[in-house]
Swiss-Prot record:
PANTHER family: TRANSMEMBRANE PROTEIN, TRANSMEMBRANE PROTEIN 245. Keywords: Cell membrane, Membrane, Transmembrane, Transmembrane helix, Transport. The chain crosses the membrane at residues 10-30, 31-51, 92-112, 202-222, 243-263, 271-291, 293-313, 350-370. This is Putative transport protein TP_0553. The keyword Cell membrane applies. The keyword Transcription regulation does not apply. It holds the Pfam family AI-2E_transport.
Length: 403
């Protein structure tokens, strides 16, 4: 084999990098379609593979029957193979169409509900602030005087209109919901085309997912074992992310939506969506939504009703968080919750709504690559392993110091 010069090697790498960037630019406009179709394919592929296994078992039984009774005619065997392939195609088509229909229906219902209930909730909040004067009166003046005294006259918040700033803050986010909903309604043709692409992509992910995975492994500039490990970790992270974090958030959202409806809270869908996103917050979690809602019920409908809501909703959501989270996670998601939380925030700011999934997956892939670089080192402890106890960790450090 002819040996390449350094200039030829550099030119080859530059050409490879240029082609990689150009191909990425081709797929960027369809990132949302590719991301969510791949996520749903990863989550539902076990069910699809189980049904495909039943089809293969039935085909094997028929083929063995032909071999034993008809001396294995090649034409019949080929016909069974074609029929099996056709059944798998139909199964993938049914999966993709049903999933697309469900996702589109749920998304459209949530978008329309948020459009109406978001405005209603904002109007109710404005009326609540103006009716009860929470930020005016003797308490506000005494608090202002206390801050002025503690700061020795350097901080004066008497001119700060807290009510106006809060309403402006909520109004900004409600307006964002309106804008996105209007864009979705106005671009209904584009949304329909994206839905078609979503169903089309999902079909091929179900049908040829293993082949596409092999192509991706071969395309990565890593050893085959490392590429397979990286891809498997990505699939595992996606499953655990949705099975643990997002499923818990979904259950909490459903429970909160039911209680918002029972207690006739204005804008139950909008508040339920806020509960979904608040479930990822550390320490406070969903309490930053249902607690103010319970207090507002106490102001508007009586403190007995408000206390009952706080007890019922709070205990139900807390039970889900305390018992369901360990049951679903089962020590599978070993990344620290603080990293998951900030990766979601940073992902949303960087990639938009897709960043809620891309952020945690990128963090997990980063630590997977770090594990690959330390492969074979006996003293290295992976972040995906359970952390050792403090005494064991101290003893290991002491032994390493002696060495």
């Amino acid at each position: 084999m002819e040996k390449q010069s350094p200039a030829q090697t550099i030119s080859l790498f530059v050409l490879l990098a240029l082609m990689f960037v150009l191909v990425c630019m081709l797929f960027v406009p369809y990132l949302t379609v590719l991301l969510w179709s791949s996520i749903l394919a990863i989550l539902l592929s076990p069910c699809y593979r189980a049904l495909c296994a039943r089809i293969d078992m039935h085909a094997f039984t028929r083929t063995r029957h032909l071999v034993s009774h008809m001396n294995g005619e090649d034409g019949c065997t080929a016909a069974i193979t074609r029929a099996t392939r056709f059944q798998k195609k139909m199964l993938a088509a049914v999966f993709s169409l049903v999933i697309t229909l469900l996702v589109t229906t749920v998304f459209f219902f949530i978008a329309i509900s948020l459009f109406g209930q978001g405005k209603l909730l904002f109007d109710k909040l404005s009326l609540f602030f103006r009716e009860y004067d929470l930020f005016e009166g003797a308490k506000q003046r005494s608090f202002t005087a206390l801050i002025f005294k503690l700061s020795r006259g350097t901080v004066d918040i008497s001119t700060l209109n807290v009510e106006e700033h809060l309403l402006r803050f909520f109004g900004k986010h409600v307006e964002s919901v309106f804008v996105y909903t209007q864009i979705f309604v106005k671009n209904i043709a584009r949304a329909a085309l994206s839905t078609l692409f979503f169903s089309f992509t999902l079909y091929f992910f179900f049908l040829d997912g293993e082949h596409l995975s092999c192509l991706l492994i071969a395309a990565l500039p890593l050893r085959k074992r490392a590429s397979a490990q990286l891809l498997e970790k990505c699939k595992e992270a996606t499953r655990h992310l949705f099975k643990g974090l997002f499923s818990i958030a979904f259950y909490q959202t459903c429970v909160a939506f039911v209680f918002y409806g029972i207690f006739r809270v204005e804008g139950p869908m909008a508040l339920a969506m806020l509960t979904f996103f608040a479930s990822f917050l550390p320490l406070v979690g969903c309490a930053c939504v249902w607690l103010p809602v319970g207090i507002s019920i106490g102001f508007t409908s009586g403190w007995m009703r408000g206390t009952l809501f706080l007890f019922v909703a709070g205990s139900s959501i807390t039970i889900i968080d305390s018992f369901l989270r360990p049951l679903l996670l089962q020590n599978k998601m070993r990344i620290h919750p603080l990293l998951i939380f900030f990766s979601m925030l940073g992902g949303v700011q960087t990639f938009g709504f897709n960043g809620m999934v891309l952020g945690p997956i990128l963090v997990i892939l980063l630590f997977t690559v770090i594990d690959l670089t330390h492969d074979g080192e006996s003293h290295y402890t992976s972040i995906f392993h359970d952390p050792p106890a403090a005494g064991v960790h101290a003893q290991s450090i002491h032994r390493q110091g002696k060495k």
